C-alpha cells in the first residue's frame, strides 16, 4: 500500500485553464532557457582561465539481509510499505539496534578505500523535515565517523595516475522514497513508499581534489569497482543502491581561495555526472564573466534538457542541528576486529591488474577490461591457467565473445559459449587447427542455436589447410587468372598482396592457414 500526500487545488474549468496556462508558460520557459544556453556557451579561451574544484558525495546501500537498526528485510522491489516496523517509521518508544553486518561491511569498504578506521565512532541525529522521513531525523554520523583520510588512484589524461583523497566514510540510514508520477492523481498527490527507510548506507565523501568532469568519472568508476570487489554493495544505480551528489565551484587559475559551490543532485549515472559537471562549470563561469555572483545552492540535473536548475539554498551543517543519538552507544571497534576485516579483503582491482599484466603478458587496456568485474576476472584466470596461450583467451573474451554479448545486452554468464569452450577455441587457434574466420563462423552458430562451442566444433569439424603444396597450387591458379594485378604488384603496388590473399582464401573456402598463406603469396609474387 502506498501512502499519499495531497498537494493539489480544487478542480473545475478555472483549475483546468490555470493548469493549461502553467504548462504553456513552462514550455515557453524551457525554450527560452535552451536558447539562452546556446547563446551563452563559454569559449575555450575563457574556460582555460578557470579551474574547477569538484568534490563528490556517494551514498552506497549495503548488501545486508536486514536494515541497519531493525530486523525488517532490506530488499528492493517489495510491495510498497510492507518492509516497515515501528523502528523504521519512528513510532514513539521504538528503539534502534545496530546491525553488526552493516558495521562489518562499512569497515571492509573503509579499508579497501585506504581509510583510517576509528576504534570509537558516534552516531548522531541529523534533523530535517521531508515527507519520506517520518521520524523527522536521520540517524547518521557527524564529527566522529567510522573512517577518515582515505584515497583512490585514478588514471589521468596524460597517462599517469592521480590520488583523490577521501575525507570520510560514515554510516547512516536511508530515507523513504517519494513517488511523484505514475498514478491517475499524480498531478495532485505524491505517494510515499517507506520500505527504504532504515536501509543501511555508507556515505563516502571525497576531498575537493577533482579538477575535471573526466576525473570525476574515473573516480566513480574506480570506487564502484572497489566496492563490487569487496561485495559490500551491488552498486546498482537503477535501483538506487549507489547515488552521487556533486559539489562544484570554479576559481581563476592560481587563486588560493575556493569559489562558491553548488551541489548537484538527481544524477543517476556516471555519464550524467560528467555531463552535469560540464554544464555546471560553464554556468558558473558564465555568471562570473558577466560580473555576477554564484549563489550557494542545491541544483537538480535534468538529463532530458541537459541542464541544472535551482532546487533550494544549500544547507550548512548547523542547519541540521546534529546531536549525539541518545538511543545508541558509541561504536567501539577493537584493533583485532579491524585487523580481521583487513585480512578478509580480496585482491583489489588495481593490484590485480598489475599482477595480471605481468603474469599473463596482457596489455594495460585488456587488463582493465578483464578486471572491471571481479567475477569476470575470476573466470578469465581460471581459463588462463588451463589454456596454452592466456593472451588468446583474453582476445576471445574481449573481442569475439564480448562484442557479441554487448550487442545483445548480455552478461558473460549468459553466454551460450562456456569458459571451457573459450579455452578450446583459443587452443585450436594456437595450434593452427582453425583460422580466426572459422572460429567466428563457429561462434555465429553457437549464438544462433544457443549451443556451446565444443559441441558445435565436434559437429562441424572445420579443417584448416596447412599443406604448403596445396596452398601453392591455389596461389598459382589465382596468379595465372590475374596477370594484370601481378604486373601492377611487381611494378610497385605492394598493397595488391591483400587482393591475392583474399582470392586464395575464397578459393580455399576460408580454410587456408592465414599466416602460411601470406608468407607463400609474398614469396610467389616476388619470385
Label every model-predicted segment.
Residues 240-252, 358-379, 391-407, 448, ...:
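Core structural elements
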Residues 337-344, 351, 381-388, 422-434:
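Extended, non-catalytic structural segments that build the interaction scaffolds
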Residues 1-5, 16-39:
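N-terminal mitochondrial targeting presequence
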Residues 33, 37-347, 358, 364, ...:
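Basic, nucleic-acid-interacting segments
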Residues 366, 379, 389-397, 421, ...:
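Residue-level detector of well-ordered alpha-helical segments, enriched
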Residues 412-423, 427, 433-507:
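Strongly charged, low-complexity linkers/loops
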Residues 495-527:
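Short, amphipathic C-terminal "tail helix"
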Residues 386-387, 393, 401-416, 424-429, ...:
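M16/insulysin-pitrilysin zinc metalloprotease superfamily fold
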